[in-house]
Amino acid sequence: AGDAAAGEDKIGTCVACHGTDGQGLAPIYPNLTGQSATYLESSIKAYRDGQRKGGNAALMTPMAQGLSDEDIADIAAYYSSQE
């Protein structure tokens, strides 16, 4: 499981589309608030690893490519803890 406090320090790239609270800033950006950390983690890894195509993959893949497994777990923990 990730560390939500550490995740808050790692969301710099995420906030442009998902905001600090995980609420998508435009309709095409999904809300991350309260999503399962497991789901978020697997989704971000799939984008990073090029396994997820279509939709927002063109945006998400480059954003996720620099993230380690630990970074992803921490970010997922952070957004899943938001209300």
UniProtKB/Swiss-Prot annotation:
Residues engaged in binding heme c: 14, 17-18, 63
| GO molecular function ontology, one term from the record | iron ion binding
Keyword list, A-Z: Electron transport, Heme, Iron, Metal-binding, Transport
How is the protein altered post-translationally, as described in the entry? Binds 1 heme c group covalently per subunit.
Which Pfam families would you find in this protein's record?
Cytochrom_C
Gene3D superfamilies tied to this protein: Cytochrome c-like domain (1.10.760.10)
Q: Which PANTHER family match?
A: CBB3-TYPE CYTOCHROME C OXIDASE SUBUNIT FIXP (PTHR33751), CYTOCHROME C4 (PTHR33751:SF9)
Record text on subunit structure and interactions: Homodimer.
> What is this protein identified as?
Cytochrome c-554(548)
**What organism is recorded for this protein?**
Halomonas halodenitrificans (strain ATCC 12084 / NCIMB 8669) (Paracoccus halodenitrificans)
